[in-house]
Amino acid sequence: KESNKVLIPVDFSNYSMKACEFGFNFAQNMGAEVVLLHVYFTPIYTTSLPYGDVFNYQLTDDENVKNILQKVHADLNTLSDKVKAKVASGEFPNVKYSCVLREGIPEEEILRYSKEYRPRIVIMGTRGKNQKDIDLIGSVTAEVIERSRVPVLAIP
């Protein structure tokens, strides 16, 4: 059964903020809650094998992982503060929202979260912060659109 939630995957880019603005308004109209989902990954050594198979070896550098986590938490707090400020100024409607942090490959975790929690809709930017201008749509967004069982709205 679907939940009354709007899932907004965020990567702290301007595209994310646009998706937030749209998503918060959408949630207000639907009487829904917003879930801001950020997926991060800890660096791994990737070895390419023939036929495009990729094997990952986890770095066991705890210090490195701790630094990544600190940065991710700081970025998420910054985003949350921005959202609070926009709600306070009336730029965003005042809807209930929560922040979720997951480790992994962004498209996989977004799809997994959708499958587990069945949001009414996924609203995300057409591209992320590491996007090349030649791409019309980001690879994460494209993958989510292709494989999601929940409606996906991509905001340019």
Predicted regions: what they are:
Residues 56-75:
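A short acidic, glycine-rich active-site loop
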Residues 37, 98-102, 153:
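General small-molecule cofactor/ligand-binding pocket signal
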Residues 32, 95-97, 150:
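A structural micro-motif
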Residues 81-122:
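Structural beta-alpha unit
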Residues 1, 108, 112-156:
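Gly/Ser-rich helix-loop-strand patches that form or flank binding pockets
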Residues 2-62, 88-89:
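Small/aliphatic-rich secondary-structure junction motif
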Residues 22, 71-83, 109:
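Short, solvent-exposed amphipathic alpha-helices that sit
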